[in-house]
UniProtKB/Swiss-Prot annotation:
Belongs to the NSE4 family. Residues 1-19 have a biased composition (Basic and acidic residues). Tissue-specific component of the SMC5-SMC6 complex, a complex involved in repair of DNA double-strand breaks by homologous recombination. The complex may promote sister chromatid homologous recombination by recruiting the SMC1-SMC3 cohesin complex to double-strand breaks. The complex is required for telomere maintenance via recombination and mediates sumoylation of shelterin complex (telosome) components. Residues 1-77 are annotated as: Disordered. GO terms for biological process: DNA recombination; DNA repair. The lineage of its organism: Eukaryota, Metazoa, Chordata, Craniata, Vertebrata. It is found in: Nucleus; Cytoplasm; Chromosome, Telomere. The gene is Eid3. InterPro entries: Nse4/EID, Nse4_C, Nse4_Nse3-bd. Residues 32-72 have a biased composition (Acidic residues). GO terms for cellular component: chromosome, telomeric region; cytoplasm; nucleus; Smc5-Smc6 complex. Component of the SMC5-SMC6 complex which consists at least of SMC5, SMC6, NSMCE2, NSMCE1, NSMCE4A or EID3 and NSMCE3. NSMCE1, NSMCE4A or EID3 and NSMCE3 probably form a subcomplex that bridges the head domains of the SMC5:SMC6 heterodimer. Homodimer, and heterodimer with EID2. Interacts with the C-terminal region of CREBBP. This is EP300-interacting inhibitor of differentiation 3.
Length: 387
């Protein structure tokens, strides 16, 4: 059994080694194919350039022969149209050559353009814009479109680098910016390190940097603690006072709410009685002055200037009618009127005919009050305010 296990493990190791070797061979082969593809592409571009140059040369050679009929045999120079055509071809050939050189340069410096913060891509785009001003044929426009596709890919990669490396700090670039800021960028041509320079240069560098940093520090606001520099201690919770202690204290002072409430009710009763007596005196005065003429109930209780005062008058008059000092009845127009009563009649009714009394409820809204004032033309209240 042990021999079989050893043979199995040995077979597995050989299989893994064989798989690794095959994978490595595949990677090497793929890399070689990529190199071959790049070489073939460059060769194709060179062949296209050579073919274009040969075609242009053939056209230039055929040009004078074809125009020999138009020119005189004594004319030693080329026709102006043919000369202009040759100049245009040379210009287009130069533009194509510059486009191919620009594309090749950008492809070679692809990693530097993407991984660094240089303006190489911007400069290449500006150069392409200058070349595009002279483009007049589709072949040059196709090269311009090819360059734009390449530039857009590089811009997309730079954008990804920007999003992923936002927190990355490039100390080399920071040092270069500091040297440019203090005016020591010329030191790169004279010496490689700052330690090799004179002490005066280093001192001036730090003095200028200190001056700029101090100016920024003066603009920053100072930080203040709300509780000061000491550590705030948590205040102890006060014990809750019991309710019975507060009640005992109130009894000792004699300020009892119940007594105050009783005094208030008694005072209100006295006020109501005084107001009822005052209105009764006004009603009796009217009856003495006009003994045979009853007074209109609405004209007596309505106050044309105050709805609330009218309600109070109705309330007080109800006590007068309840106690029998006046009575209310309806006249011929079915309107309520007030009539006086005799004292003897009041005593008799209290003794024997108290069961004949009737009670009624009067409903008066704000609109009803306004209608009564306008209908009865009440301009002045019969019950004057006592205050």
């Amino acid at each position: 059994m042990s021999e079989e296990k050893c043979s199995l493990t040995g077979g597995e190791e050989k299989g893994e080694e064989l798989a690794r070797s095959l994978a490595w061979q595949h990677l090497v082969k793929q890399a070689e194919e990529d190199d071959d593809d790049d070489e073939e592409a460059l060769k194709k571009e060179e062949e296209e350039e050579e073919e274009e140059e040969e075609e242009d040369e053939e056209e230039e050679e055929e040009g004078p022969d074809s125009s020999s009929d138009d020119l005189s045999p004594e004319a030693p120079c080329m026709h102006p149209d043919l000369l202009e055509l040759a100049v245009d071809r040379e210009k287009c050939r130069s533009i194509r050559r510059q486009y191919r050189q620009l594309i090749y340069t950008v492809q070679q410096n692809r990693e530097d353009i993407v991984n660094t913060a240089s303006d190489s891509l911007t400069e290449a785009l500006e150069e392409a814009n200058v070349l595009f001003d002279g483009v007049s044929r589709t072949r040059e426009a196709a090269l311009d479109a090819q360059f734009l596709v390449l530039a857009s890919d590089l811009g997309k990669e730079k954008a990804k680098q920007l999003n992923s490396d936002m927190s990355f700090f490039n100390h080399v670039a920071f040092c270069e910016l500091l040297l440019v800021f203090v005016g020591l960028n010329w030191m790169e041509e004279e010496c490689e390190e700052l330690s090799e320079c004179d002490e005066s240069i280093a001192l001036s560098f730090w003095n200028m940097l200190h001056k700029e940093a101090t100016a920024w520090m003066l603009q920053a606001e100072t930080f203040h603690f709300i509780f000061g520099s000491f550590k705030a201690e948590r205040s102890a919770r006060k014990p809750r006072q019991e309710h019975h202690k507060r009640a005992c204290k109130m009894e000792g002072n004699g300020d009892m709410p119940t007594k105050l409430r009783k005094l208030d009710v008694h005072a209100n009763q006295e006020t109501t009685e005084k107001e009822v007596e005052r209105i009764l005196g006004l009603l009796q005065t009217y009856f003495q002055k006009y003994p045979d003429t009853p007074v209109s109930y609405f004209e007596f209780v309505i106050d044309p200037n105050s709805f609330s005062r009218t309600v109070e008058n109705i309330f007080y008059v109800s006590f007068i009618i309840r106690d029998g000092f006046a009575r209310i009845r309806l006249d011929q127009d079915r309107l309520p009127i007030l009539e006086p009563t005799n004292v003897n009649q009041v005593d008799e009714e209290n003794d024997s005919c108290s069961y004949c009394r009737k009670q009624g409820v009067i409903s008066l809204s704000l609109q009803d009050w306004k209608n009564i004032v306008s209908t009865f033309e009440i301009s002045e209240a019969m019950i004057k305010n006592s205050y």
